[in-house]
Amino acid sequence: MIQNPSSSSRILNPPKTVPSPLSKMTDENLLTSAKLREQIEGRIDSHSRHYQFTGLADEADRGSLALLSDALHQEGKDLEETQLGSVLMDRLVTDRATEAVQSGDSSMMSHIVGVTEQDLDASSLTLPARLLDLLDNNGALTTVLAAGDPNSGKTNTVWLLTELARSKWDDVMVISNARASAVDLRVTSCHDLACALLRHKDRPKVVVIDEGSTHFDARTNSYEVASQWSPLLKRMSKLGVEIAAVIGHTGKDVDPELKRLTSLGLYKPDQTTLEVYSEWPADSDMPTDLLFGGPLENLEATSVEYDPDEPAPWAWNLRAGLFSKDLEWSALLDELQDLGPDS
């Protein structure tokens, strides 16, 4: 069945660029600002000393808002319960949230939404920005390996990342061996992929390879992974690839070389939970170094249309020693096209 969720289930639309300071915020910063927001809204004790606009209003406006709030309080009213106060608070929250996402101020974002990394919801304001920061990878190629239990939504997660990539890089081209509404160019072999990358080297690209547990099986395709995928992957950054993602089943059957080259490991224990890791040791069935302080809950459905039962074929037919030749990219493309795939 084609998956086509409603627009209401879309992941929050993040900014096109997110500066690196977002990733430098400490758990203590997030905890403090989130708990302050909870105090202000009365979700935990000792909130009476805080105004509703605490941490949101500019210094020039705080005095006037405090006087107005105090006057209303003497009449038994709260500022946010009045029509004027409601409009003011909505405007303050909207303005601060926009500024926080654009500047990468995770402390302000945590304050606004009242979440911490210990209870991070995948639909919260901070998550898209944090994921974008990971996908950026300081300008280096991001290599993703997604695995998990059966029917846990591994493919959905990778297409969500593709949607985020489209919001970060202009004119992103999606290349995949799978059929999906987000795919701009479908390739079904390593030769075709290499030709596509060379032909469109000046355009930012996302590469998605589905059925990775079959195509990158350690028992049957270890040589092909080492002799074809690894050399191509190591040159993808020069060829304009921002993200190279492989969707597997479990970490047990995927070739160790693929795991070793992974910079972002995704594990899906169930449909609504995602675990994000920064390492995947070559000899391990599971990735390591869990990010975000724990699993992400309530992961939303992608807007990308795809059929999970549709085949995603792949052939290992890239000619050996291709990148050892002293050729410019355009000449290398001509060479590939003239020789054709390796039989």
UniProtKB/Swiss-Prot annotation:
It comes from the Viruses. Residues 1-24 are annotated as: Disordered. Residues 1-11 have a biased composition (Polar residues). One of its GO terms (cellular component) is virion component. Keywords: Virion. It is found in: Virion. Its main location: virion. This is Virion protein 8. It comes from Halorubrum pleomorphic virus 1 (HRPV-1). The lineage of its organism: Viruses, Monodnaviria, Trapavirae, Saleviricota, Huolimaviricetes.
